[in-house]
Amino acid sequence: MKFNVLSLFAPWAKMDERNFKDQEKEDLVSITAPKLDDGAREFEVSSNEAASPYNAAFQTIFGSYEPGMKTTRELIDTYRNLMNNYEVDNAVSEIVSDAIVYEDDTEVVALNLDKSKFSPKIKNMMLDEFSDVLNHLSFQRKGSDHFRRWYVDSRIFFHKIIDPKRPKEGIKELRRLDPRQVQYVREIITETEAGTKIVKGYKEYFIYDTAHESYACDGRMYEAGTKIKIPKAAVVYAHSGLVDCCGKNIIGYLHRAVKPANQLKLLEDAVVIYRITRAPDRRVWYVDTGNMPARKAAEHMQHVMNTMKNRVVYDASTGKIKNQQHNMSMTEDYWLQRRDGKAVTEVDTLPGADNTGNMEDIRWFRQALYMALRVPLSRIPQDQQGGVMFDSGTSITRDELTFAKFIRELQHKFEEVFLDPLKTNLLLKGIITEDEWNDEINNIKIEFHRDSYFAELKEAEILERRINMLTMAEPFIGKYISHRTAMKDILQMTDEEIEQEAKQIEEESKEARFQDPDQEQEDF
């Protein structure tokens, strides 16, 4: 698809075109397109149509019918509406606070290049560029906000803004885009060989819908609802990695919680309604209409009802009791006719319910919500408002260990927010080449800071267990197993650590303060 590209995207368009030419040179032909599970809308375009500005992809994307964008917009709106439920918000806050940890004098996230083969000079330059990326994201202050948006929306986009005249200066700003207005597109370029379609390559880009905004660029005025093609290299894109059953749309981690969250909210509202309607004694009016004709009796009933009417309604959106139209009825009197002079008009009461203290249903749905979000049930706020008991980490449950693994999985998928702009800066400034980056990408590690208190508890517990094992094995050390084996297998020390500790022990043995006091008295 070829049409005018805005001047601010020109450097990125050249970069994408260069990558596509490199792809053509490799001549990697297949019978199927790559399955990347990244939510891109794929269009099959022949090699001849790829050069046409009005191919099938153009007509589909720029037409009035956009099922893909509508589905994405509805999904994100659904996830955001869930956050209005305080139960969902509390559970998501547990996930975000474990993934992004703020502590004094520590970096929220750091770059580890220890296993990479870059020279020390290159490593220092990469660390400086990584700091610039964090500054552009304001991650030290807004890291949890970025992670929360990514988790809730299931995706996050940043526009990499550079100076088109001086691209070697790198990224100037990372500007977040509305994920509901961005669409990821992949054109699959095919050729026909012996009646069979062969995939020759693919092109990727983003389509941004300006929605209700209008803007001016390159001396032209663009009205609201304009669709803009953005080169893939100009956008940072990180997604959840989860796809729906058809494998075409990205869904969020909140997708599993939609049903239990709505059921919990419905049940909580139903409990309020039930308690207000059944807890108080309701009035029962027996209106004596005597031998009145049916029409007169109905008019008399209506007159008494309008005079003595008592109606209370409950607004589920605010949780308030009020009396307005279009609200769910709560308490209302019963009105019954009496004839033939059996009794005069009287007011009686209907006893209220006596089982309104049962909350087991709400607790069950709350547990279902936390299980859907993979948050340990031990983190559900308890009715007693009790605190958390710490006992040197010995009470760490399997759920907490599973939750820690889940947090690491989320952090790993969120890493693209740092790696993509870092790679862009390194390439624009000529610090490394793209081949060097691809060769070392598996050795470039993003380390998220963990809660130091729990980390220390875990390390102390592990060390305590190793020392206890060493104490039990002490009678056999030197007889059945060697000291070196005990240090490596029981204390889990490496060869370097063993040599280092041996030298340190030898040096300390020469200092008086580290010698045995009893031995010193004997020598004296």
Curated annotation (Swiss-Prot):
Residues 500-516 have a biased composition (Basic and acidic residues). Transmembrane segments: none annotated. Residues 500-524 are annotated as: Disordered. GO terms for cellular component: host cell plasma membrane; membrane; viral portal complex. Its main location: virion. It comes from the Viruses. The keyword Coiled coil applies. It is found in: Virion; Host cell inner membrane. Residues 486-516 form a coiled coil. The keyword Hydrolase does not apply. One of its GO terms (biological process) is viral genome packaging. Forms the portal vertex of the capsid. This portal plays critical roles in head assembly, genome packaging, neck/tail attachment, and genome ejection. The portal protein multimerizes as a single ring-shaped homododecamer arranged around a central channel. Binds to the terminase subunits to form the packaging machine. Attaches to the host inner membrane most likely through interaction with host yidC and forms together with chaperone gp40 an initiator complex to form the prohead. Homododecamer. Interacts with the large terminase subunit. Interacts with the major capsid protein. Interacts with the capsid vertex protein. Belongs to the Tevenvirinae portal protein family. This is Portal protein.
